[in-house]
Design a protein with these regions (language model features):
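Single conserved hydrophobic/aromatic residue that forms the stacking wall/gate
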Residues: 615-624
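Substrate-binding/active-site clefts of carbohydrate-active enzymes
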Residues: 261-270, 299-300, 304-316, 322-477, ...
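Short amphipathic, basic-aromatic surface patches that mediate peripheral association
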Residues: 40-49
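Bacterial Sec-dependent N-terminal signal peptides
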Residues: 1-21
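Active-site-proximal helices and loops of the catalytic beta/alpha 8
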Residues: 226, 360, 368-371, 485-583
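Aromatic-rich carbohydrate-binding modules that target alpha-glucans
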Residues: 51, 56-132, 147-155, 188-189, ...
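Short beta-strand elements
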Residues: 152-170
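Basic K/R-rich, polyanion-interacting modules in nucleoproteins and related proteins
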Residues: 168-205, 260-314
Length: 624
């Protein structure tokens, strides 16, 4: 037998570091003696403040257990509130804190958490813990003797300590994976599937779902096959959506990183039912905050265009589109259904490609999309998976290619691949740990970095990125990608501006793998590096973003200096192939017409509408 500590994840009202500045031991169990130190300066107060109060201070406290129906109900409590009982039943020595420093007060819970509540409760009759009942969390509210002053967590919530539960975990079954299964969800038929989690170095994993009533059950312990954990499920209800996550080493609640649909407790409530009708509700009993979804017998989208062929890449006229703002009607509520109504308008502009700003699942729901977390799932705030496919299908019917803007240089902390190997584990704000198979501990870029930095030299990262690109090309019939900040596709230290042969090798490898699957895929890199490096990539038939915002802005503003369009041409760079994607505006640049309204000379500023039409039509000719 191997003994592990099983950590039950709760909906915490306060992180340990926010108000409780010290807890000994740092990861207590219900069988431990625990000493807790509170910092009054980090409390909020419903009544009078306890800051600088000299005492006495007492704790009103309770314990949440596995028997708490809602996951928040106190099953046993100590020290009733003074306005509800006589002082002798609330101001007891067991919950009286000791001052140990300026605004620092300490409480000792002894001889153990369970014994402490059994010996000191004022509940009538006293609550008796069941033999198999698990203590999950202790909650506190600090107060003075008569309850006219109190201290609690920010937002008028109680402070909270998570408890670890000691369990003896038997060795799991070692068994080879079924033949042909891949990482993620593998559907066999309308009632059966196999889940596969790649987690090298981890000891055990459980499937958590409604099938187990969101509890740890041996029937849902995953089998182990080397670096993989897997489980096959049968007798599922065809067409039904099941939410699930993996509990890894009793500590980490991980949504499947390969899932096509993600639910979030915090953000799903902000998704409009107009954009996403009948969205599955977040499961009430689930202890994790992010879960994945499987669905057998899912209806196939009936593609109308199955053989779309876009224009030659040197004939692309691209419209960059942020779904959030494109049809927002005064609010950040743009969606795919509204964007569909504008396709004929976009076609009338003369475009033949739309570059959709990132629509992989992001951290939150209202940013530009560059905070990617789940790379195989769509962002639900814009619509359903079927809505995305219909948008692409309708674009193809109009001769418009769809290019996916995608972020493959970093991911954010709620990404399962980050959390699975974070330091400390599971922390969404922590940096990747040294054993993370996909991410660098620290970005090698000394100037530009966001979130967790992908280690592009890692074989596992390369496998992952190849899978991501292959998925979107096949499942959504996308026509190509625009790779954000490809300057970050390297482990070479520095700001990314120097010539980097390793980066060239990495980008060529990724591009070649994509073209094995789709030979005519549009591959655009936001590289913005030196001429030598960009020329090598262009000669590999890759397209490079060519920023020309300043020349076009100067031209429309009536400023002669710096208004040459020479840099828009690939030939000006010495390229033999016309692979420069020149743009006068992008999401990172100011709109040239607005710039002219502020900085234009003379009548350009005062007669903007007439002048803008003339100048912008001229710019359109240059870019065509």
């Amino acid at each position: 037998m191997r003994t592990y500590i099983l950590f039950i994840t709760l909906l915490c009202t306060l992180s340990l570091k926010a108000q409780i500045v010290d807890c000994t031991p740092s990861k207590p169990t219900g069988d431990d003696e625990v000493t807790v130190t509170f910092d009054l300066t980090k409390c909020s107060f419903q009544k009078a403040s306890l800051v600088d109060f000299e005492g006495p201070i007492y704790s009103h406290m309770g314990v949440i257990t596995s028997e708490s129906p809602s996951g928040t109900e106190w099953k046993s409590r100590i020290a009733l509130w003074p306005d509800k009982t006589t002082p002798d039943k609330c101001n007891i020595d067991a919950v009286k804190l000791q001052k140990v420093g300026d605004n620092l007060w300490q409480l000792k819970i002894t001889p153990s958490v369970k014994e402490f509540f059994m010996q000191n409760t004022q509940m009538e009759p006293p609550y008796e813990f069941k033999a198999d009942e698990q203590l999950l969390s202790i909650e506190f509210v600090l107060r003075n003797a008569d309850g006219t002053m109190d201290g609690r967590a920010t937002g008028d919530k109680k402070s909270n300590i998570k408890l670890l539960l000691s369990h003896t975990i038997a060795p799991g079954e070692d068994s080879p994976r079924p033949e042909g299964v891949q990482r993620g969800i593998n559907y066999h038929n309308d009632e059966s599937l196999t889940l596969v989690l790649f987690a090298p170095g981890k000891q055990f994993a459980y499937l958590m779902s409604e099938l187990s009533n969101w509890e740890v059950k041996e029937d849902y312990r995953m089998k182990r096959d080397g670096d993989y954990f897997w489980i096959t499920l049968n007798h599922l209800i065809p067409g039904k959506e099941y939410a699930f996550y993996y509990l890894v080493d009793g500590l980490l609640d991980i949504a499947d990183p390969y899932a096509n649909k993600i639910l979030e407790r915090k953000f799903d409530k902000g998704i409009s039912p107009v954009a996403y009708p009948n969205l599955m509700e977040f499961p009430e009993k689930c202890k994790a905050d992010i879960v994945s979804v499987w669905q057998t017998a899912k209806p196939e989208y009936p593609w109308e265009v199955t053989d779309f062929k876009g224009v030659r890449q040197d004939r692309l006229t691209i419209y960059e589109l942020l779904l959030r703002d494109f049809t927002r009607n005064g609010e950040y509520k743009g969606n795919l259904k509204l964007a569909l109504e504008k396709l004929d308008y976009l076609k009338s502009l003369g475009i033949n490609a739309i570059e959709l700003m990132p629509f992989c699942k992001i951290d939150g729901i209202t940013n530009w999309g560059y905070h990617s977390t789940f790379f195989f799932a769509t962002e639900k705030v814009y619509g359903t998976e079927e809505d995305y496919k219909k948008f692409i299908d309708e674009c193809h019917k109009r001769g418009i290619a769809v290019i996916m803007d995608i972020v493959l240089d970093h991911a954010y902390g709620t990404c399962s691949l980050v959390r699975l190997y974070a330091d400390p584990p599971g922390n969404t704000k922590a940096q990747p740990a040294a054993d993370n198979p996909w991410f660098n501990m620290v970005s090698p870029n000394t100037k530009y970095s966001w979130g967790a930095d992908f280690n592009h030299e890692s074989k596992e990262t390369q496998i992952l990125l190849d899978s991501i690109c292959a998925f979107w090309l096949k499942e959504y019939k996308l026509d190509g990608f625009r790779f954000d900040f490809s300057k970050g596709f390297t482990n070479t230290p520095g700001d990314g501006s120097a010539y980097d042969p390793d980066r060239i090798r990495i980008i060529k490898r990724l591009s070649d793998e994509i073209r094995k699957r789709k030979s005519d895929a549009y591959l655009i890199y936001e590289h913005l590096a030196g001429d030598q490096e960009e020329k090598e990539l262009a000669e590999h038939d890759l397209m490079l973003w060519g920023k020309q915002n300043s020349p076009f802005s100067n031209a429309i503003n009536g400023v002669q200096k710096g208004s040459s369009f020479k840099g828009a041409m690939a030939s000006s760079k010495g390229w033999s192939k016309n692979n420069r994607v020149t743009y006068m505006e992008s999401h990172d640049e100011e709109r040239v017409a607005y710039n002219a309204s502020v900085n234009g000379i003379g009548e350009i500023r005062t007669e903007l509408e007439a002048v803008s039409y003339t100048h912008l039509r001229a710019h359109e000719t240059v870019l065509d």
